[in-house]
Amino acid sequence: MSIKRAQLGGTTKHIFVTGGVVSSLGKGLTAASLGNLLTARGLRVVMQKLDPYLNVDPGTMNPFQHGEVFVTDDGAETDLDIGHYERFLDINLGQSANVTTGQIYSNVIAKERRGEYLGDTVQVIPHITDEIKRRMRLQAQPGPDGDPAPDVIITEIGGTVGDIESQPFIESARQVRHELGRKNCFFVHVSLVPFMNASGEQKTKPTQHSVAALRSIGIQPDALVLRSDRPVSEPNKRKIALMCDVDEAAVVNAVDVPSIYDIPSMLHDQGLDAYIIDQLGLTQAADVDWAGWSRLLEAVHDPKHTVTIGLVGKYIDLPDAYLSVTEALCSGGFAHDAKVALKWIASDECQTADGAAAQLSDVDGICVPGGFGVRGIEGKLGALRFARENGIPALGLCLGLQCMVIEYARNEAGLAGASSSEFDPDTAFPVIATMAEQVDIIAGGDLGGTMRLGLYPAALAGGSIVAELYGAAEVSERHRHRYEVNKAYRAQIADAGLWFSGTSPDGHLVECVELPRDVHPFYVGTQAHPELRSRPNRAHPLFAGLIGAALDRQKASLLFDVAADA
């Protein structure tokens, strides 16, 4: 089924980003950087990631295999690249921004069961590719609130050219170009140029073969982004341009840089955005406005302070499992002209008081992020107790808040052995319990996409740290959880001194906890995932608050040392 011109959503252009040779080349960062540049030129840009796995979404995938699950405002569980897109473009994306093979096949099979194909033999071409094209063009329509259609849709195709799994997506992109016309589509291919230590030279052949594979399925790339650990020589760039039939001006080198936020300026300096604008006829594009991004880069490269934050987690062997958390912490540092030195701490190392002291004695603050399952929980409790008793600024996220409640219940509220029904169904004091609406879902075994997901409001108590940081009495944050603070124990825990400073507007769900400032300088937990709405040039208030408190502790420690020496 061809895309009809009347249904094109105006003059929306498509940029497709593919990858070759190896995975994890940085296609997502390349796509996000292009989006950043085009947005800085005044264009309306939306982003999309096509994932070739058969999972419907990454919500039930192992963090060690997939990395973090990025949740959007509308409750979609998506790929971590969606987080890059939101941070680089400073936009909020939705469910349509992430498409998986599992979603495509589920939709097609459901249509077949309903008889919508009128007895046709359902095949990859045209039925699967038609559904992919429909999803590709979904964001080309005007917004529900009257927002105009975007000028550009940038679509990253996951996987590596040549993989069986990604072939339907690449074929669909080829068909979109055929149906919309070559002046409305642009293909960027990201490829590796490896350096061979034995011969002391860079090799262009892998890129040539990767482009040949792409051309064999009907796509001639319009631009090449060459990934390398050192600059690609001009002769090699000219050779690649010749052998791959790409304009020399469209062959750019994305060399490893100190910060991911340097990538947009690196691509701009080589003229990639200008070339794309010219080829797509985006005459409405203005010059790049670097004002906001330049201030960010100054904070990145010229920090006035350095602060050490311990990230106490159970998935630290794969940092991508906490990608948005680490980016939010760094952004909190940018807001204070500070470099955040992350100390990765396996929560198991903090189970004992001595272990927690050994791991946390040299940090200025800690962050305890979300997670699932019982492994590592006692270590998180140990880390939080050490931070609470020693005045170390601490921020708990989702499970981190729940651990704050459990630790306080055990050690301050007289509820020895308190736990969560997630970890210990038989605990005498289930201070964290399954949400009422989740009980039947868990019993039914339907775990995919069934948590409390997406944007929910919270009412903040006047005079609280969280209300001060947000500068508002009510805020909305993204959530991803099945468990909540058990209302039956709230009064007893609050009487012991832990302040439930944020709740759902109806007062039913606990959204924030904290210790008063006269008890602890910064001990704050949130049931939400505020890291998902943080931006590099606009740090989230809770993360900025943590870094500010950590800097205050650091300065106080230095003053104490000076006084002691005197």
UniProtKB/Swiss-Prot annotation:
One of its GO terms (molecular function) is metal ion binding. It comes from the Bacteria. Residues 1-282 are annotated as: Amidoligase domain. Pfam families: CTP_synth_N, GATase. The active site is at C398 (nucleophile), H529, E531. ATP binds at S24, L25, G26, K27, G28, L29, D81. It catalyses: UTP + L-glutamine + ATP + H2O = CTP + L-glutamate + ADP + phosphate + 2 H(+); L-glutamine + H2O = L-glutamate + NH4(+); UTP + NH4(+) + ATP = CTP + ADP + phosphate + 2 H(+). Keywords: ATP-binding, Glutamine amidotransferase, Ligase, Magnesium, Metal-binding, Nucleotide-binding, Pyrimidine biosynthesis. UTP binds at S23, K203, T204, K205, P206, T207, Q208, K239. Its EC number is 6.3.4.2. Mg(2+) binds at D81, E156. InterPro entries: Class_I_gatase-like, CTP_synthase, CTP_synthase_N, GATASE, GATase1_CTP_Synthase, P-loop_NTPase. Pathway: Pyrimidine metabolism; CTP biosynthesis via de novo pathway; CTP from UDP: step 2/2. Residues 308-556 form the Glutamine amidotransferase type-1 domain. The keyword Plastid does not apply. PROSITE patterns: GATASE_TYPE_1. L-glutamine binds at G371, L399, G400, L401, Q402, E422, R482. Allosterically activated by GTP, when glutamine is the substrate; GTP has no effect on the reaction when ammonia is the substrate. The allosteric effector GTP functions by stabilizing the protein conformation that binds the tetrahedral intermediate(s) formed during glutamine hydrolysis. Inhibited by the product CTP, via allosteric rather than competitive inhibition. HAMAP family: PyrG. PANTHER family: CTP SYNTHASE, CTP SYNTHASE-RELATED. Homotetramer. Catalyzes the ATP-dependent amination of UTP to CTP with either L-glutamine or ammonia as the source of nitrogen. Regulates intracellular CTP levels through interactions with the four ribonucleotide triphosphates. NCBIfam families: PRK05380.1, PyrG. This is CTP synthase. It comes from Leifsonia xyli subsp. xyli (strain CTCB07). The gene is pyrG.
